[in-house]
Amino acid sequence: RADQRSLVLRCKTGISRIELDQLLYCEVLGRTLLFHLSDGGVLESTGSMDELARQLAPYEIFLRPHRSFLVNMEYVQNISSRSVTLTNLVQIPIPHGKSSDIRRQYLEYAFRRKQVML
């Protein structure tokens, strides 16, 4: 689809294109970026989380609860004071004192998406 947003990655297996709505979260281990997909697959690329976060910022669907993680807010199931739980039950840690800022960012996203808040 023409309106589909995607990311092109240089991986060990070649060049891969992933749709942003299929990206659950990304984590960095050293200089390796791991892209966790909704189908359970994981793609590996090299780079920095800071650069990736800058590239994805205009889409306004990603949350950075921790310096090593970038989360697609479409897949957030719960936010507690210590972690963000995704729909696949993976828990992403939130550093001490950052949970209120993470909640605020998520609520802003939910209001932009016109999701019902109870």
Please identify what each model-predicted range represents.
Residues R1-R5, L107-E108, R112-L118:
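Inter-domain helical "communication" segments and dimerization helices
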Residues R1-T87, P93:
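Conserved binding/recognition cores within well-folded domains
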